[in-house]
Amino acid sequence: MLSKLQIEQYENDGYVVPDFKMPEDTIKKIEERHDELLKKHPEFKNYCPAILHYDESFLEFCKNKIILNYVEQILGSDFALWNSSFFAKPPINGHATPWHQDGQYWPIRPLATCTVWLAIDDAKVENGCSRFIKGSHTEKKLKSHNTNGNKTLTLNQEP
């Protein structure tokens, strides 16, 4: 469960890092399934935008009860998973994710959504760990994004 302080942090800052670690055996299963996916779809080496479309077995990991409880504490009990993506972050990958608002990519209104990010690779500044602009969610509106055709980006839009 998220603490009251963690929920307040999410409400104020727009993100929270829970005290949770996926069990090692589950991480190993995710890595094995990802390896199998890449054998069939090598084009997803850096990014797979809709992994459940290509391998429904990943849904098992999206149903983790602890993670679902965290989401329920943030959004309430009426929520749905509508997408699951895979961003590879091995060392010296060369693919960057530009600053963006997740809601710009999601056709969901109102913007009552959240992202659950589970790091499988070590998340460090050197390989592109997630960074957030504290409080940027409080405006509750999307900034316009422009298309960027740079092939070294995992996402093609940025403000």
Language-model-derived ranges and their functions:
Residues 1-108, 144-145:
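Non-heme Fe(II)-dependent double-stranded beta-helix
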Residues 15-17, 115-119, 132:
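Conserved hydrophobic/aromatic beta-strand scaffold that supports enzyme active sites
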Residues 35, 40, 121, 152-155:
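Juxtamembrane helix-loop transition sites at the ends of transmembrane segments
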Residues 77, 91-93, 111, 122-125, ...:
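Short, charged/polar surface micro-motifs in flexible loops or helix N-caps
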Residues 100, 107-125:
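Short, conserved beta-strand element in jelly-roll/cupin
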Residues 125-159:
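Double-stranded beta-helix
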